[in-house]
Amino acid sequence: MSHDAKPGQILCAGTNLKIAARATGRLYDRALAPFDLNTMQYAILANIAQAGRMPTMALAEKLSIERTALYRALAVLERRGFICTDAGRGREQILSLTDTGEALRLRARAAWAVTQDAFVTAFGEDWPTFLTMLYRARALSEAMSDPTEGIQ
């Protein structure tokens, strides 16, 4: 395996993934801007809607987001009246969408879908492979970050 970069090429997986994530995030953020949502806020609404009711820790795990960052995002959505929280077991909070939040999610979903469809179409038949590679990169990175897991 070569670690030599050609002129203008960046070989670092971490750098390339961060650059791609920022560019992709900006693309989706522009699509969601008319709804005063960003990509993470939309992902939160979409995942809660899919689950119906969802514990905060399950959402944090699914989106691979630290609790403090999630709580900040949830506070904004709750303040705007899009989500509500109920007490769960212990200190756990159970999240659900309000009617206003569900209505916003449905309106924003159309803009998200246009962007998603364009992205998928641009990859063409390579989309399933690309998606599989993203899942692998995430799983590998998480395993390598967890000293109890090691490299699989």
Describe every region a protein language model picked out.
Residues 53, 75-132:
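Charged, amphipathic alpha-helical coiled-coil/dimerization segments
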